[in-house]
Amino acid sequence: MAKKLFDFIVFDWDGTLMDSTATIVKCIQAAAKDLSLPIPDADAAAHVIGLSLGDAMQAVMPNVDPKYYPKMAERYRYHYLLRDHELPLFPGVREMLTDLAQQGYFLAVATGKGRVGLNRAMNSANVLAMFDATRCADETFSKPHPAMLQELTRELGQDMQRTLMVGDTTHDLLMAANAGAASVAVEYGAHDALALASLAPLYSAKNVFELHQWLTDNA
């Protein structure tokens, strides 16, 4: 068996492990509608997924009065909480995580979600025990700042050079680059394949099964 390139695999959550992209887009649009603000189109709303909630609201609606951003965040939370218990993991995620853990990898999540939201989602999906550590945007800097990866590697005593970030957005890949970690993209989430390819990930998976196979063969 070939020597592993990585010891530590860090996953984004929304759009990478959980099938939540479309729901997040609809909740951003519903929040804007509630406040009678211009409703962002689906592409604009999807682009900000992965950022902290505050940064996402500013990025998706840069031309509105800043006083609306906290209200947008509140309305977004309202709509998301109505739906989040229905959100599934992508097919194959549970099996992939189980297999990777059995192979001896350290596993973590780095997400733009808040701590309460991530814990609720992970408990609902019954995967909390599969991860060695997690980091949320309300605990440190938002992506693409490298802090999440820096803190996770420090917490688990891992080497950044042997750390792999897996995500569906350019925010994930930029965070990895900023931290000095390698990255793999997934094309089934929020950002399109062309945008992801521009950041030269080691691999770009079209689905979880391709991702699982690549990690098994190459990571």
Provide a role label for each language-model segment:
Residues K33-P38, V64-K67, Q102-Q103, N126-M130, ...:
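Short helix-capping segments at alpha-helix termini
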Residues I49-L81, P91-R94, D99-A101:
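A metal-dependent, Asp-based hydrolase signature
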Residues A2-I9, A101, G114-R115, N119-A219:
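Asp-based, Mg2+/Mn2+-dependent phosphohydrolase catalytic module
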Residues A2-H47:
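Active-site neighborhood of HAD-like aspartate-dependent phosphohydrolases
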